[in-house]
């Protein structure tokens, strides 16, 4: 039997009670029950019963809703709120509530009051920042030598900024594609085309400079309107740097308006967000949405082939794939991550329910770490999270050119993951048995918030449980817990 878009809907939603989500949708669109009923060609009383969970939402009604309101197929499933559920689970684990809050309770809370849930997550972020700042003051007060003043983490704020927007910035993405088309750009040799665009439209001269500092990729001089780009960059990398500057000079007002939508960003984070949005524009310009999305579907998301076609590297392709969430033309919802050998995650974004730990650490059983043992080769994994959701992961190491034999070298592993339901669309799933639960590797978001008490790889005890202490018994499991294993 072939897979289709309808079969998962019928299987997942045949007895779905989603009154809270339907009410939320109606209120977001500014509709009354009468107006919603008219749009769906249903009776008002029937819509009222759906909103009060007196009737399940049937497949025909779901199809009507997704068509009329351009909703994703997962909007009315529990997966649609899974990101918020995961964030709240992290919150309750981190603060150590007196009475355990079950996953079912969190899911019900999110379904009925999602905005309150988002507010709780935001408050917790500020609480953690304040706590870390207080710890910094305490450390300086007790330290023998003076420590630098505690500072906020603007990059974490900006990560949250993109995370909260599912890593897709619609207005900026559309602007990049529109400028690409209107300027007569074509794939291939974009570094040269962009240099001409900067000269003709903005009067900016682009110079390939071999005198820039070793770590500098570009340097713009507003007074002379000269953009200097490092000579050691590859053509695709040069194009990215020029496109980033193009965003900062040509889309400055739009970028400022997008940053202004988040009043929680600190002053320093706003500057970082502007650079992040300029980088987003650059990726969207080099890989224009419709053309790139079409190529990704045709090539079954083969990252290397996409990189060859568009003249960019592995990491750039992976990041762009994670942004393909345009309404009516969505790609596979991906998770994008970059980590080093020590497990430090320097880049992470997700358009899915996959949960990154904010408490510290990542799972050593995660295939992204295995990539370092097989440099430059794709490694794959079918992984299951503690909440029961399964994901398909691919990962590969990327190494930047160093500054000579004795100079420092950068080495990262880049991972790209998606819900297992989408894995068959990826060329990397070839030869992998996707429907066999025995192939799934149980992983978690990080030891401190992972409730897999039977995991032999655990490095820290679970914050939400109690460590079992028994003088008369020994165990091969580190930090044995009194909690039931997942």
Swiss-Prot record:
Phenotypic effect of disruption: Cells lacking this gene are unable to grow using either propionate or cholesterol as a primary carbon source and the transcript levels of both prpD and prpC are dramatically reduced regardless of carbon source. When the mutant grows on medium containing glucose or acetate as a sole carbon source, there is no significant difference in growth compared to the wild-type.
Q: Name one GO biological process term.
A: propionate metabolic process, methylcitrate cycle
Q: Which gene encodes it?
A: prpR
Q: Which residues form the HTH cro/C1-type domain?
A: 22-76
Keyword Phosphoprotein applies: no
User: By its UniProt entry, which Pfam families does this protein fall under?
Assistant: HTH_3, Peptidase_M78, ScfRs
Q: InterPro entries this protein is in?
A: Bact_TransReg_Diox, Cro/C1-type_HTH, HTH_RamB, IrrE_HExxH, Lambda_DNA-bd_dom_sf, ScfR_C
Q: Indicate the transmembrane segments per the record.
A: none
What are the recorded GO MF terms, alphabetically?
A: DNA binding; DNA-binding transcription factor activity
Taxonomic source organism: Mycobacterium tuberculosis (strain ATCC 25618 / H37Rv)
What does this protein do, in the record's words? Plays a key role in regulating expression of enzymes involved in the catabolism of short chain fatty acids (SCFA) via both the glyoxylate (acetyl degradation route) and the methylcitrate cycle (propionate degradation route). Required for intracellular growth in macrophages and for the assimilation of cholesterol-derived propionate. PrpR acts as a transcriptional activator of prpDC and icl genes when propionate is the main carbon source, and as a ramB repressor.
SMART domains xref list: HTH_XRE
**Family indicated by similarity:** Belongs to the short-chain fatty acyl-CoA assimilation regulator (ScfR) family.
Put simply, this protein is called HTH-type transcriptional regulator PrpR
UniProt keywords, alphabetically = Activator, DNA-binding, Repressor, Transcription, Transcription regulation
According to the record, what induces this protein's expression? By propionate.
